């Protein structure tokens, strides 16, 4: 998987993703990261890529041409056109299902806005997907872009080392993950549930399913209702 990030702050992207799981994935060659500085495509010596908005209003807007040129420079080096994802609070909410869809791509171009956003004309010209990570506003698209890259990278074979880890994550099957415990067996008078110490894998699996359903019912009733509609047989796990 190759990620190409169009940004005004490439060092933010590189530093933010250069450690932990994504950093190791890049070292192994499982994913690559190409942080493209949009300022490199400015048509002036000051590398200025923003200007005032027509019609008035506060703040500056990223201009169309530098964004377009940066995107076309990346696309020209690919075997086939890549999807261009614009990180914006106006986009559809990013989900695990969307991450699974994106993980099937060979290349992804992620566009990060800044200031008051980007000239609408270039968005209409190059963007294939608009994605939001939540109903709030950030300073720029870099943090959301890193969220997308981290989430998608986890789904690339070999990145986690143990494929089961990703398969049991929250949202992978439409439910929140069950609670987990490690040593010691007793901590501050709190004991690990006895079923997890029983060695009975069937009982452990049932307990985890029950806990996953109950946790989802309490914390995300919207997900719970959807899951139960799609899996009516799961009622046998409900207490």
Regions found by a protein language model. Give the residues of each.
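SAM-dependent methyltransferases
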Residues: 1, 184-239
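N-terminal nucleotide/polyanion-binding subdomain common to many enzyme families
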Residues: 1-75, 201-223
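Hydrophobic/aromatic beta-strand patches that form the interior of the parallel beta-sheet core
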Residues: 4-6, 34-36, 83-85, 108-109, ...
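Short, solvent-exposed amphipathic alpha-helical segments in soluble enzyme
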Residues: 20-24, 100-104, 126
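Short glycine-enriched loops at secondary-structure junctions
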Residues: 38-41, 114-118
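S-adenosyl-L-methionine/SAH cofactor-binding core of RNA-modifying enzymes
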Residues: 63-114, 120
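Structured adenosyl-cofactor binding patch, chiefly the S-adenosyl-L-methionine
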Residues: 122-169
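Internal, active-site/partner-interface "lid" segment
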Residues: 143, 155-194
């Amino acid at each position: 998987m190759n990620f190409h990030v169009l940004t005004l702050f490439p060092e933010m992207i590189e530093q933010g993703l250069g450690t932990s799981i994504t950093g190791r994935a890049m070292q192994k060659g499982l994913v690559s990261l190409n942080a493209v500085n949009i300022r490199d495509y400015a048509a002036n010596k000051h590398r200025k890529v923003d200007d005032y908005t027509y019609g008035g209003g506060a703040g500056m807007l990223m201009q169309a041409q530098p964004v377009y040129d940066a995107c076309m420079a990346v696309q020209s080096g690919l075997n086939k056109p890549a999807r261009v994802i614009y990180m914006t609070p106006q986009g559809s909410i990013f989900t695990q299902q969307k991450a699974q869809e994106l993980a099937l791509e060979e290349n992804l171009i992620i566009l990060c806005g800044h200031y008051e956003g980007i000239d609408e004309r270039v968005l209409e010209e190059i963007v294939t997907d608009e994605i939001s990570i939540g109903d709030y506003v950030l300073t720029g698209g870099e943090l959301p872009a890193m969220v997308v890259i981290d989430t998608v990278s986890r789904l690339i074979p070999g990145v986690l080392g143990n494929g089961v880890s990703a398969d049991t994550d929250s949202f992978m099957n439409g439910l929140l993950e069950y609670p987990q415990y490690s040593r010691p067996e007793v901590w501050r008078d709190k004991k690990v549930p006895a079923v997890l110490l029983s060695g009975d894998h069937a009982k452990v699996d049932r307990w985890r399913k029950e806990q996953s359903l109950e946790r989802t019912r309490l914390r995300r009733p919207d997900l719970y209702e959807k899951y139960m509609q799609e899996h009516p047989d799961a009622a046998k796990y409900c207490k």
